[in-house]
């Protein structure tokens, strides 16, 4: 299976956790790629504060580790995979904070990246927490497989964050802005 993610100016070796001698599954999906390509079009300052939700194996965290990154996930395996992939790519962990879904979110966030979870109650909890810390200057990009984005998903985004737009689908994934 492919373990090399090459997009824009990003070259990463990514593995699922635990790492196996023969990987059977890829550690990122087309939604990760779509998010990374979309963020590449933004002007992101060096010390930007990036908040990432539900980064399964660390593709987004590794891609933006040079910024002040806080990664929020309810999965211990995700936490372990993020640490493993940061080490695998010899990336600094100094500006990366990994926390669970119950911890308080940081203030003054410049960019929020959300991998939309399948559980709507988790998404609602995360959006409710997020609504208290984002400002009008915060850029929010959420992504998932197009088949996993429903009217109820969009309704939650609009309830907590205001008007939302969706992108065209690419590689069967879609973004919400």
Residue spans of the language-model regions?
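Conserved SAM-binding loop
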Residues: 82-85
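A short glycine-rich, Lys/Arg-flanked "PGG" loop and its adjoining helix->strand segment in the class I
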Residues: 123-139
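Conserved SAM-binding strand-loop segment of SAM-dependent methyltransferases
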Residues: 90-102
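S-adenosyl-L-methionine
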Residues: 1-46, 56-60
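A short acidic, Gly/Pro-enriched loop at the edge of an enzyme's catalytic core
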Residues: 48, 99-116
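Non-catalytic substrate-recognition/targeting regions of SAM-dependent transferases
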Residues: 1-20, 144-177
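Conserved S-adenosyl-L-methionine
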Residues: 64-70, 136
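Conserved SAM-binding motif I beta-strand of class I
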Residues: 68-74, 142
């Amino acid at each position: 299976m492919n373990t090399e993610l090459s997009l824009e100016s990003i070259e990463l070796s990514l593995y699922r956790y635990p790492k196996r001698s023969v990987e059977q599954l890829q550690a990122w999906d087309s939604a990760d790629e779509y998010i990374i390509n979309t963020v590449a079009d933004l002007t992101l300052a060096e010390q930007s504060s990036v908040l990432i939700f539900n980064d399964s194996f660390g593709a987004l965290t590794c891609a933006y580790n040079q910024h002040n990154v806080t990664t929020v996930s309810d999965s211990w395996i995700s936490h372990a995979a993020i640490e493993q992939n940061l080490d695998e790519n010899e990336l600094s962990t100094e500006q990366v904070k990994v926390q669970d879904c119950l911890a308080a979110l940081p203030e003054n966030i410049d960019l929020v990246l959300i991998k939309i979870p399948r559980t709507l109650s988790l998404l609602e909890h995360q959006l409710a927490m997020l609504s208290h810390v984002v400002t009008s200057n915060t850029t929010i990009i959420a992504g998932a497989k197009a088949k996993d984005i429903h009217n109820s998903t969009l309704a939650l985004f609009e309830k907590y964050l205001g008007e939302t737009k969706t992108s065209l689908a690419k590689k069967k994934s879609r973004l919400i802005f």
